């Protein structure tokens, strides 16, 4: 019994030590993020985007939209994507074995006809049945292929495209009109950049018209509001901070841009993966650096994409478990990066961070709650210590989230009404009472399910921005 009490006693200090380390890391990332965003906003204000593309040689882009059973939003989505601001871009819609009217709607609304184009398979994908061109929109291409999933659809489109830049989005992503101008800029400024990600925002509560966010607002759902703050914190602080170390391991599957030659050189997306958006980024870092090529994956803090967040516990739970499984899978597949000096900051700092705090973090957090309350019940930990610890954790979480809201307001000002800013700050406080614990529990369940071999992808049920969505490919903060 004495041994068990000692284990419980010292485990509490282990959790406290873990908490202090992660607080230190987050404070460092926050300081770096404030500096980076301040510099970025000054640079963006100094020169107009369109002026840059008039002066410099721009790189043509291919926008890839995997679509499986997207009959409820495919027409509006394609119409809006055809109106993006960019000098030269191609739009490829991949019909991934849809069993609904997705293909029929594309025929009816975009005047597509089958071409004689024969694809050259530089990377492996399911067979392409046909390639269609539009008589009304010269830059629109539609691919019909056997069902193989999102990653396989992207690979098929890469085989068709010959443009140097590849942008991948979800069929239900809502893009800013100038998103391609913003996402392509880093490729023009640095030839070593192989991938760029941008900030994804929550569209729940926003007014959407003709495929674009017309008025930014907040959802009436507290679950959606919690995710707004969560996304602000993850993108403006987390990814922006890691960008300083060239340590971005995840680019959101809802909107990302890559150099085509880099994707082809590593064999394209991994089909059958739970988290293909993270795996491809980690593999780019690993394989290109192994070949001694100077590479950089970077992040722009601009809000370039809007996505629908789950508003039910069931759907949100499924999403977070899937994200956790995807993270574990990517870490397991590329474990050779762990404390590997060859990969510098990536191997010695960023990858270990993901192992200790993203993979095993949920276990430590959930077990920490359990052991802590057992300690209180048995009198191992004094009540005043517990009060101080939980107060510090609450204060830290609130400050971190509130800083993210303030940084958004100072830099991008998407939420212009005072009522919404007040609501966001209230949300930043309330998320510490339940929401954060639920997300830790869902991630912990994702870890357990992965360990026991339950690695299914699952569905992401959506209401849709016009209240008529159906399940399809899931958008993600990832």
What do the predicted segments below correspond to?
Residues 117-153, 159, 163, 177-272, ...:
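Long helical/loop segments within the catalytic core of UDP-sugar-dependent glycosyltransferases
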Residues 29-88, 104-107:
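N-terminal signal-anchor transmembrane helix
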């Amino acid at each position: 019994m004495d041994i068990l009490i000692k284990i419980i006693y010292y485990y509490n200090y282990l959790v406290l030590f873990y908490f202090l380390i992660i607080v230190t890391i987050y404070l460092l990332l926050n300081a770096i993020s404030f500096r980076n965003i301040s510099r970025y906003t000054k640079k963006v204000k100094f020169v107009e985007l369109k002026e840059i593309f008039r002066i410099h040689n721009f790189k043509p882009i291919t926008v890839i939209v995997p679509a499986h059973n997207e009959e409820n939003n495919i027409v509006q989505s394609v119409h809006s994507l055809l109106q993006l601001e960019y000098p030269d871009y191609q739009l490829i819609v991949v019909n991934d074995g849809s069993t609904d009217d997705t293909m029929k709607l594309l025929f009816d609304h975009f005047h597509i006809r089958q071409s004689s184009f024969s694809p050259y398979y530089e990377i492996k994908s399911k067979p392409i049945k046909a390639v269609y061109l539009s008589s009304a929109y010269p830059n629109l291409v539609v691919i019909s292929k056997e069902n193989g999933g999102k990653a396989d659809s992207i690979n098929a489109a890469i085989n068709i495209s010959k443009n140097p830049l590849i942008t991948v989005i979800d069929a239900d992503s809502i893009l800013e009109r100038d998103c391609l101008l913003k996402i392509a800029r880093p490729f023009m400024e640095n030839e070593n950049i192989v991938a760029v990600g941008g900030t994804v925002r929550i569209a729940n509560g926003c007014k959407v018209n003709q495929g674009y966010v017309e008025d930014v607002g907040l959802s009436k759902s507290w679950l959606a509001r919690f995710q707004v703050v969560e996304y602000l914190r993850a993108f403006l602080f987390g990814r922006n901070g890691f960008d300083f170390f060239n340590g971005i391991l995840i680019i959101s599957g809802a909107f990302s841009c890559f150099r085509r030659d880099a994707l082809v050189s590593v064999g394209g997306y991994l089909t059958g993966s739970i988290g293909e958006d993270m795996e491809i980024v980690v593999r780019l870092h690993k394989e290109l650096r192994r070949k001694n090529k100077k590479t950089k994956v970077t992040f722009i803090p601009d809000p370039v994409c809007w996505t629908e967040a789950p508003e039910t516990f069931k759907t949100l739970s499924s999403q977070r478990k899937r994200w956790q499984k995807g993270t574990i899978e990517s870490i397991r597949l590329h474990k050779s990066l762990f404390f590997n000096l060859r990969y510098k900051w990536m191997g010695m700092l960023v990858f270990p961070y993901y192992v200790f705090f993203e993979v095993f973090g949920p276990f430590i957090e959930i077990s920490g709650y359990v052991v802590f309350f057992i300690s209180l019940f048995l009198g191992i930990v004094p009540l005043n210590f517990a009060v101080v610890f939980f107060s510090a954790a609450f204060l830290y979480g609130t400050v971190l989230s509130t800083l993210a809201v303030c940084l958004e307001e100072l830099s991008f000002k998407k939420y212009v009404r005072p009522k919404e800013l007040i609501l966001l700050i209230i949300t930043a406080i309330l998320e510490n009472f339940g929401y954060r614990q639920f997300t830790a529990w869902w991630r912990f369940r994702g870890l357990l399910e992965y360990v026991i071999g339950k690695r299914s992808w699952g569905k992401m049920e959506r209401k849709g921005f016009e209240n008529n969505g159906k399940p399809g490919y899931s958008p993600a903060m990832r």
